[in-house]
Regions:
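PP2C/PPM-type serine/threonine phosphatase catalytic domain
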Residues: 1-246
Length: 246
């Protein structure tokens, strides 16, 4: 069984998108646009995250690696945009929608997970994530007079392997997909899997609320979220897969 809790932030439409197909599920956190959001007539990030989610549904299977599944989904959307957005190939990559993502695929004996950027997964008392993105968030937390300029500067370094501060993140050309973190763990004893965006991670700093397998649609969970909602203005999304009794 799959349950979802999602809530729009205060600054823009909800750019967290989630989905599942068969034994695979994901949460995508679209990056706030810093160089415009109207190549698709407005709300480009939200529309693009939904398009990637739809493409993932077409590509998921039990044969490919999760990074390959994501890569092909990204390339599908890129191909579509190349035909619908005038001068697409002349647009700097950092001006196009980008994202963080986490994906989980559940098999009979094991659970495969993939993370790119700062979304997270919680299973059986442990957090699984792409730690390489910590330095990017740390960079953006510098005390400077112009935060917006700092964030734009950071965004321009995405998927730049030649710059010492370059980093990998989800993008339409799929360049960063292979650099995401992916592992496989034994399924035994795991009864609940939680995937969530970085906004939700900010609220769930104390993961004890998840330890006993709480239902994310339970009023206890919702009350907890509302109690700590002040910690972030970002969108918050958590997707739960319950394995017990399957």
């Amino acid at each position: 069984m799959i349950e979802v809790f999602t809530q729009e932030g205060t600054k823009h439409v909800n750019q967290d998108i989630y989905g599942w197909q068969g034994n695979t599920m994901w949460v995508i956190d679209g990056a706030t646009p810093l160089f415009g959001d109207d190549l698709l007539g407005g709300n480009d990030v939200q529309k693009t995250m939904q398009n990637i989610s739809d493409a993932l549904k077409r590509h998921v299977d039990d044969k490919q690696s999760l990074s390959n599944v994501l890569y092909h989904a990204c390339k599908d959307v890129e191909s579509e945009y190349r035909h619908t957005i005038s001068g697409y190939d002349l647009i700097e990559k950092y001006k196009l929608p980008t994202f963080a993502i986490t994906i989980v695929r559940v098999n009979n004996m094991n659970i495969e997970w993939y993370g790119l950027g700062d979304c997270e997964i919680y299973m059986h008392g442990k957090v699984y994530r792409d730690e390489s993105f910590d330095r990017v968030n740390k960079r953006n937390q510098k005390e400077v007079s112009d935060k917006f300029a700092l964030h734009r500067e950071t965004r321009m370094l995405l998927n730049d392997k030649n710059h010492p501060e370059g980093y990998w993140i989800g993008s339409l050309d799929g360049a960063g997909c292979v650099y995401g973190k992916q592992e496989s763990i034994a399924r035994e004893d795991i009864e609940n899997i939680y995937l969530y965006s970085d906004g939700m991670s900010t609220i769930l700093q104390d993961k004890s609320i998840l330890m006993d397998g709480i239902d994310v649609n339970d009023s206890v969970f919702e009350n907890y979220i509302q109690k700590y909602r002040y910690l972030t203005t970002d969108d918050i999304t958590i997707l739960q897969m319950q394995l017990k009794g399957e």
